[in-house]
Amino acid sequence: RHGLPPEIHRANTASLPALLLETVAAVKAKNFETIAVVCRTEDEAAEVRSILDITDADSSAFHNGVMVLPVMLTKGLEFDCVILWKPDESRYGNNPREAKLLYVAITRALHELHLMLDADPSSLLL
């Protein structure tokens, strides 16, 4: 991957949505063509769409340059920037299946990778 090292953004649970909005705005200001917020599940993707005020649940469409989708739908895709939502131990545990999903998520980024956390990161990232 070309670009900057991964950036870790930490906040408490109540502040994380605002931090996500700030991060998305900062990334959009860099004029990347493709930005993805990658979540562990479809339910989390729906939560993030709500935070970003994306009302259309069609995860295959870009909305204001940002796509929100669960990790299972990212395989084979690439994005200029990936924002990984809550890659903590409860979502990506230390087992082969979770390791593969996390690997897929973090390797979708061509130029920038941002990790949004309200807990300690998955041990797979350490």
Residue ranges, per PLM feature:
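Interdomain hinge/linker at the junction between the two RecA-like core domains of SF2 helicases
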Residues: 1-11
